[in-house]
C-alpha cells in the first residue's frame, strides 16, 4: 500500500496545488472523488488495465465521467492515463484529502461507540479533542456492537480506549502481573 501512496503523492500534490491556486478545493475534491469511484468500478478496471492505447483509455474514462470533470480535470485524467496511472485514482483522492486536511489544520478523529452518539455527544467529544490537539477536528463515528459501554477514540497512530471492554482488558493485565 505504501508503494501506491508513493506513486499517488505527486499527482495528489499537483492537483492540490492547482486547486488551491485556482480557489477550487471543493470542486477538485468532488472531481477526484467521482473519478476515484469510476476507477474502482470492475468494468472500468478491465479497460484501464488493458493493453489499449492510453489515448483510447483516457477517452473511454472521460466519456464515463461525462460532465463531472471540467477541462482541467479532463487534462489531469489524460496525463494519468498517458502514464498508466488511472488505477491509483482512489489513492490520489485519499492523498488529496490528507493534503487538504493538513492545509486546513483539520485532524481526522474516529470515534467508535456501542450505539449511535447524539449530536450533543459528538460536539462535546469534538470540543474536547480540539482542546487536546490544539486544532480543528473532523469526527467520523463508527458503531461497534461488541463494545458494551464507552468509546474508543483514534487519531494518527493513537488509540484512546475508554470502553468497558478496554478497561476490563487493562484490569485483567494488571491482575495477571
Curated annotation (Swiss-Prot):
One CC-aspect GO term: proton-transporting ATP synthase complex
Sorted UniProt keywords: ATP synthesis, Cell inner membrane, Cell membrane, CF(1), Hydrogen ion transport, Ion transport, Membrane, Transport
The UniProt record lists the keyword rRNA-binding: no
Subcellular localization, as worded in the UniProt entry: Cell inner membrane
GO molecular function: proton-transporting ATP synthase activity, rotational mechanism
Location, primary (coarse class): membrane
A matching Pfam family: OSCP
Membrane-protein topology: Peripheral membrane protein
InterPro entries: ATP_synth_OSCP/delta_N_sf (IPR026015), ATPase_OSCP/dsu (IPR000711)
Subunit structure comment from the entry: F-type ATPases have 2 components, F(1) - the catalytic core - and F(0) - the membrane proton channel. F(1) has five subunits: alpha(3), beta(3), gamma(1), delta(1), epsilon(1). F(0) has three main subunits: a(1), b(2) and c(10-14). The alpha and beta chains form an alternating ring which encloses part of the gamma chain. F(1) is attached to F(0) by a central stalk formed by the gamma and epsilon chains, while a peripheral stalk is formed by the delta and b chains.
Family assignment from sequence similarity: Belongs to the ATPase delta chain family.
Record's function text: F(1)F(0) ATP synthase produces ATP from ADP in the presence of a proton or sodium gradient. F-type ATPases consist of two structural domains, F(1) containing the extramembraneous catalytic core and F(0) containing the membrane proton channel, linked together by a central stalk and a peripheral stalk. During catalysis, ATP synthesis in the catalytic domain of F(1) is coupled via a rotary mechanism of the central stalk subunits to proton translocation.
Protein name: ATP synthase subunit delta
Gene encoding the protein: atpH
Amino acid at each position: 500500500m505504501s508503494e501506491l501512496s508513493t506513486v499517488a503523492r505527486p499527482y495528489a500534490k499537483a492537483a492540490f496545488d492547482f486547486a488551491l491556486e485556482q480557489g477550487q478545493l471543493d470542486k477538485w475534491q468532488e472531481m477526484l472523488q467521482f473519478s476515484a469511484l469510476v476507477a474502482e468500478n470492475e468494468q472500468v478496471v478491465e479497460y484501464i488495465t488493458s493493453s489499449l492505447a492510453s489515448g483510447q483509455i483516457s477517452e473511454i474514462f472521460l466519456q464515463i465521467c461525462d460532465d463531472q470533470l471540467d477541462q482541467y480535470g479532463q487534462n489531469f485524467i489524460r496525463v494519468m492515463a498517458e502514464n498508466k496511472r488511472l488505477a491509483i485514482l482512489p489513492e490520489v483522492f485519499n492523498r488529496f484529502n490528507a493534503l487538504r486536511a493538513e492545509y486546513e489544520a483539520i485532524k481526522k478523529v474516529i470515534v467508535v461507540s456501542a450505539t449511535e452518539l447524539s449530536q450533543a455527544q459528538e460536539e462535546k467529544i469534538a470540543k474536547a479533542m480540539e482542546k487536546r490537539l490544539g486544532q480543528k477536528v473532523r469526527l467520523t463515528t463508527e458503531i461497534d456492537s461488541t463494545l458494551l459501554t464507552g468509546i474508543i477514540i483514534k487519531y494518527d497512530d493513537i488509540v484512546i480506549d475508554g470502553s468497558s471492554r478496554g478497561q476490563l482488558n487493562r484490569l485483567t493485565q494488571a491482575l495477571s502481573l
